[in-house]
């Protein structure tokens, strides 16, 4: 979650009017704000980064202190392109620097592969992989001490058919297994959108110490395209080993995204819907309703 150090309230969103502290967790700070970045590709990454730039500037103005968002929030989570932004913020990158990442390398990353390969995916993973290694550091691990705050990345384990949540909480159930996973690889796994990029292979140790290779695809291919609810659960549900207190005076969840699909249909228009229209509507409705039901395909990592 994004948790702010600030006191006072500005338009009810940027600051939490609280001095409460967590009773456990990885990074300690006063106040609680949760920040989830849902997935959008080229335009979404840039647009969400612009929202982050505005937030960063506003907080710097209010506090009179120049600080990256990674130092102002206790947890930052992201799915797909949101995972790139979340990881960058946790490493202390400025919102402007992350926006420039998309502007500088978008064309390179989204260069289409030769025709025979397009049957499987539009783009090669090599440019994106190279830039993620360059931006986050090839040797940076999920447990790296350079991460300024708690990180949550959503990915879909295609081999198991389960949604995996990668985090850097040392008290988390699967932290011992995941601590040495390269950060760039975790982020790349969350951005592996089917038909756009090939899956990301990752070798992950199991409970017996045996290493198992899995294939991961975009975390948006799950009910956690917008990870806000999972970020809230990670922070507050005791089984996730944070156990932060809830309440309007103790925690603030900020969810930044650049798209919304309304489920309402204008009067008289439903009768005009064709098969494709109803397919899209059904998928949107399923994502909306399932996020509030008990997850059956998830594995906290």
What are these regions (language model features)?
Residues 95-127, 168-172, 178, 225, ...:
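Non-catalytic peripheral regions of patatin-like phospholipases
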Residues 35-39, 71-80, 150-156, 215-218, ...:
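Extended hydrophobic secondary-structure segments that form protein cores and membrane-embedded regions
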Residues 43, 48, 110-111, 146-237:
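Active-site gating loop/helix substructures
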Residues 43-44, 86, 223-224, 260-263:
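Flexible loop/turn segments at secondary-structure boundaries
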Residues 126-148, 162-165:
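Active-site periphery "cap/insert" segments of enzyme catalytic domains
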Residues 12-35, 43-135, 173-176, 185, ...:
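Patatin-like phospholipase
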Residues 28-31, 65-71, 143-148, 209, ...:
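Short helix-terminating capping/connector loops at secondary-structure junctions
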